[in-house]
Amino acid sequence: MNQQQSALLNNLTIIKPNFHAFTAKFHSKLAQSSIEMNSPTALQFNEKSFTLFCVLERIVKHLDKPASVAPFLAHHLMYLKKSGASHSDIALLSNAFYETLEEHLGKHFTTESQLAWKKALRYFESFASNVLFNVTNVVSLQQRMQQKQSNKI
């Protein structure tokens, strides 16, 4: 387990006893945002809070093994697809989640854990964009060479 995973798991341990309050705050932030997807009601969100915690914990525990996280995360991303999530919704979800962490953890949201969550959420955004919308931030070598050629003309 690397330092990033350790920081994330420590934060999850702090949040776990009061995860229903965390998910209620997260739902509230999503409701206030300009998210386009059909989000669940507060009651439905609360009912799914244990599942959300288990999914988060499993992903964090295996972050150092992307090959084992990818299929699991892809499976759970289908919920977002069924909910009509747009590409911009992915960033809104990440931002709301990060803000909720910041408020809920308070002084326990150290610089180390902030960086770890930012990195994990960037991974989530990139992976979700690729799986749900076939958008990637990786440019193939051939594409890059063609771009350079067209710039020379």
Summary of predicted features, one role per range:
Residues 1-153:
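Core of compact, soluble alpha-helical bundle domains
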